[in-house]
């Protein structure tokens, strides 16, 4: 799944008109790097029983040390809505929970319509907290979902 997240990050960056030089692996995240940007687009695959990818545990610590109160944060994740229907894209829900007290402005909430899953902690107030993507079962929907989400995020941060 790690390579799927990286591929999705690059595809999303392209739709957001973000140069590839501004796409970073979370393992390289530093306070100085975070402070360079007003908008953060954060993505993670969901591992095991609805867990973050391991590098994110340190990444969250870095983010919590930063002043995010004037930053916009958009989340995306990849998951498997068939095999892990009860923890679909939980990783972005974990990131949301970990960062909601930083006073950042979350953007890019996505309607649950069109998704088939049983449960996800990434659903808050009836919407996903970011963009969930399923490259295992619904890869034919990914490009359209990314395009629509990127336009939404652009509008929300302008």
Protein language model annotation of sequence segments:
Residues 7, 11, 15, 19, ...:
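FMN-binding flavodoxin-like domain, especially the glycine-rich phosphate-binding loop
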Residues 19-30:
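A short beta-strand-loop structural module common to alpha/beta enzyme folds
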């Amino acid at each position: 799944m790690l390579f799927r997240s990286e591929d999705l990050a690059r595809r999303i960056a392209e739709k957001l008109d973000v140069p590839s030089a501004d796409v970073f692996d979370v393992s390289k995240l530093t306070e100085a790097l975070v402070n360079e940007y007003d908008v953060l687009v954060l993505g993670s695959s969901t591992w095991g029983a609805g867990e973050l990818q391991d590098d994110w545990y340190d990444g969250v610590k870095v983010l919590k040390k930063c002043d995010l109160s004037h930053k916009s944060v958009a989340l995306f994740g990849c998951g498997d809505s068939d095999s892990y229907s009860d923890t679909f894209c939980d990783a972005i829900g974990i990131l949301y929970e970990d960062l909601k007290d930083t006073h950042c402005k979350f953007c890019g909430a996505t309607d649950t319509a069109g998704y088939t899953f049983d449960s996800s902690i990434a659903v808050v107030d009836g919407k996903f907290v970011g963009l969930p993507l399923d490259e295992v079962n619904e890869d034919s929907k990914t490009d359209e979902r990314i395009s629509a989400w990127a336009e939404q995020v652009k509008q929300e941060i302008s």
